[in-house]
Structures are given as C-alpha cells and as structure tokens.
Amino acid sequence: MPKSRRSKVLTLAQTEKKGHEGKAALFSGVQQSLDSFDYMWIFDVTNMRNTYLKRIRDDWKGSRIFMGKTKVMAKALGHTPEEEHAENVSKLTKLLHGAVGLLFTNSKPDEVIGYFESFVQNDFARAGAVAPFTHVIPAGPVYSRAGQIPVEDDILLTHTLEPQVRQLGMPTVLKNGVVTLLADFPLCTEGQQLDSRQTRLLKLFGITAAEFKVGLLGYYSKKGASVEFLQSAPGADEAME
C-alpha cells in the first residue's frame, strides 16, 4: 500500500520569512547591479505577457532585469540625495510606480532604445483591456475572421461553432448548414473596456486587440552620474523638480 503524502503546511512565520527574504534579495540585487553596470533604465509594460518578457530576458542575458515590488526597488535606489545609493539616482525613483521595471546594462542608449522601439507583439486581449479599435461583424454568413479580411480570402465559420457564438451574444442561426448573423453585431468599440464575452469572441475569430510593448521612461548613466528622462515618461516633470 503506497504511503500517503502529507500536504506541507506553511506557517505564518515561514511565509513572512520567505517574503522578507524575497524583498532583501530584490533590494541587494538592485544595489549590486547599480554598482556593476554602466546604465540603469526604468521601463513600463503595456499588456503584460510573461512569454514576451521571458523573450526579452533571453535577449538581454548579459544584463539584469528586475520587476517586482516597486517600493523595495525605490528604497534600494534611495528616495532622497541623502539616502541614494549612487549620486543623482534618486531623481528616478518617482517613476517607480505601476507596472514598471529596471534594466541594468552596459549597452549604449541608442542600442537599448532601438531594441525596445522594435519589440512590439500583438496578442489576444484580456477582459478589462481597452479596445484599440471598433469592429462590427456584418450580417449574413459568418466567416472565420469575422470581416477582418475579404470574404474571397476567408472561409465560412464551421457550423459546429454556432451554439458557442450564439451563447456569447451573437444573434445567429444555421441556414442550410451555414452560420448566419441576423443583424450587424458590434464586437468591440474603440476606447471601451472589453468583457470576457468579447475577448472570447475576438480570440475565436483570431483578432488580436492587445499590443505588448515596453516604454522607456528614463535612464541613469554611471559616467557623470547623469539622469535622462524620455519625453513620453509620465511623471517626468515631477521627477525633475
């Protein structure tokens, strides 16, 4: 008879210890990287996807990327000139809020900017995302791409999906085995939040409505202890004060 496996029970003290160790590792990792690399960048992420972030990490293996508790990262850099870990680096800490991270690298700024400007990935939207466009599926036979491409380049939606799209809100019927939309159907509207029903339909029709991209907010250069804010960085005006 096989031995029964007892489930591990983590005590509150163990959980708190692991949390403290994680924060300490992040804190020291940020400070050590600031000492070791020529540049530190602050970046934000739109439509976070771990798959694409992993690809970025792989592309920048000689560098270090941190994404974690922003308060810990800010504390590691220092909030004021008196407590900053390196001269002038505290000027960047006001940018550390939201979905942001740190990139430590020896690569020149032009190389970093060029890489991230070109690294844009289209993906399926998740519930809560804002629709970047308006799309209406036209009445009549429903095609697999829902009007995204010319019908002569498309194929009819398989009849087995009719119950599913109808359940998701599309007014459809089967006519001679063809999924048919009884009226124009507004799938999404630009500027409005998407719900789970809409995101499921978008994915079913192969329509990507999310864009993963990394925005560079500013960087610190060890040479000359200089700080540069990118024009698009939110909060840069406040940080420069």
Swiss-Prot record:
Report one GO cellular component.
preribosome
The record, for InterPro entries, names:
Mrt4, Ribosomal_uL10, Ribosomal_uL10-like_insert, Ribosomal_uL10-like_insert_sf, Ribosomal_uL10-like_sf, Ribosome_Assembly_uL10
Which cellular compartments is it found in?
Nucleus, Nucleolus; Cytoplasm
UniProt keywords, alphabetically: Cytoplasm, Nucleus, Ribosome biogenesis
SUPFAM superfamilies hit by this protein: Ribosomal protein L10-like
Does the keyword Membrane feature in the UniProt annotation?
A: no
Q: What is its main location?
A: nucleus
A GO biological process of this protein is:
cytosolic large ribosomal subunit assembly
Q: Read off the Gene3D superfamilies from this record.
A: 3.30.70.1730, 3.90.105.20
Q: Which domain of life is it from?
A: Eukaryota
Q: Which Pfam families match?
A: Ribosomal_L10, RL10P_insert
Record function comment: Component of the ribosome assembly machinery. Nuclear paralog of the ribosomal protein P0, it binds pre-60S subunits at an early stage of assembly in the nucleolus, and is replaced by P0 in cytoplasmic pre-60S subunits and mature 80S ribosomes.
Q: How does it assemble?
A: Associates with the pre-60S ribosomal particle.
Stated family: Belongs to the universal ribosomal protein uL10 family.
* The protein, known as: Ribosome assembly factor mrt4
Q: Which organism is it from?
A: Schizosaccharomyces pombe (strain 972 / ATCC 24843)
